Amino acid sequence: MEKKYILALDQGTTSSRAMIIDEEGEVIGVAQEEFDQIFPKPGWVEHNANEIWASILAVIAGVLLKTNISSKEIAGIGITNQRETTVIWDKESGNPIYNAIVWQSRQTEDICKQLRKDGYEDTIRSKTGLLIDPYFAGTKARWILDHVDGAQERAEKGELLFGTIDTWLVWKLTGGRAHITDYSNASRTLLYNIYDLEWDDELLKMLNIPRAMLPEVRPSSEVYADTVPYHFFGEEVPVAGIAGDQQAALFGQGCFEKGMAKNTYGTGCFLLMNTGEKAVRSENGLLTTLAWGIDGKVEYALEGSIFVAGSAIQWLRDGLRMVRQSSDSENYASRIESSDGVYVVPAFVGLGAPYWDSDVRGAVFGLTRGTEKEQFIRATLESLAYQTRDVLYAMEQDSGISLKTLRVDGGASANNFLMQFQSDILGVPVERPENKETTVLGAAFLAGLAVGVWKDKNEIKKHWKLDKRFEVEMKDEQREDLYEGWHKAVKAAQAFK
């Protein structure tokens, strides 16, 4: 049988998905399985790593069954994962010693406070491109080693293994033959030097993480090891591509050249700009991260996150009951010519890049007796575009690269009003692809490159198909007036504490 399909595994925060992708980059079939969220205390979020593994086995079986494709026809497996989520397991038995601590979880705040107190901020920033925050994996590993009896000692003896979710899945799929991660995931741990491309002794000492438990860091596109036959219907299939979800989306969007950027409009927004083979150190509170490593060289990215995006539209629907379903927001916003001076600052959990203000709260400005729900809905959608411009402007300042176009994906990218306004407020075209599953495509493309389904990035580029290009329609003067109003609104919200 000809091996012409790639199986892409997308291990997310609330569910696991498997997709089969053909040589044309088309999705042939999908299977999805949700799993439980564990909330031991307020602000803590954990997953059962064995349940995640069970969900992966279920979706692999499900998608092969659904598509009637044999395991013999799979040329390779690509993995993309929720980043930063951390597992520590027993090397012999393969059992996790504690739940996986999820990227959203704030349970390591005390460890972070101590690191700040000890003056490690500049060291961490200069070596990892990251900030001290419970978000990243290193403090999660420290927390597990602190809270499980005997764990530190066992880790030092080499009896325990650490990994982000990609590492855990590769280890399980290969029957323990490969304990690895890729550059993109390693760069989110607080332990990896993104300039020297190695686990950093000073950082390991800082968190007292034994080197013996760390995975080997490998390129994002490479044959790492084969599946054990009993996990893949009797077949040994190469696991050949890995990238964290946002980096995978950048790759799946075909953002291969320096200066190309993508925005994923999910619950929040994740913006990444490819900065090429040079790491750009941010002066604006953005993260410097590894995008991927292929063919012996690595590329870097700048990353900015917006905390509230799609969740602002959910707030209109569930909190304020202004719309029945999220997609109605487009219709309401399009009925009027403008928001009539109304601004919504959706700082429900503070503001992310480039403000990094965790104390500011949501606010609405410019209401008059004539304000109706259309203006309110439109202003809420516009806030997503303003925040995106804030981050992209910071990226341009840091990198010295002018953005030419923005590629978009994620749920809210289907909103035509929002995408048009995004183009207008940025002053550059916005491109939405036909296939919105860019994260999965990224993982598939990385694996396919390693096993020869696609020859090179140029061939992959041909499989990126445009759904709609939104051209700039707004005059410069109007754009700057609106954006100035947004900044006034943010400043006023920040003053109200």
From Swiss-Prot:
It is an enzyme of class 2 (transferase). Keywords: ATP-binding, Glycerol metabolism, Kinase, Nucleotide-binding, Phosphoprotein, Transferase. GO terms for biological process: glycerol catabolic process; glycerol metabolic process; glycerol-3-phosphate metabolic process. Its EC number is 2.7.1.30. Activated by phosphorylation and inhibited by fructose 1,6-bisphosphate (FBP). It comes from the Bacteria. ATP binds at T13, T14, S15, T267, G310, Q314, G411. Sn-glycerol 3-phosphate binds at T13, R83, E84, Y135, D245. Pathway: Polyol metabolism; glycerol degradation via glycerol kinase pathway; sn-glycerol 3-phosphate from glycerol: step 1/1. GO terms for cellular component: cytosol. Key enzyme in the regulation of glycerol uptake and metabolism. Catalyzes the phosphorylation of glycerol to yield sn-glycerol 3-phosphate. Homotetramer and homodimer (in equilibrium). Belongs to the FGGY kinase family. This is Glycerol kinase.
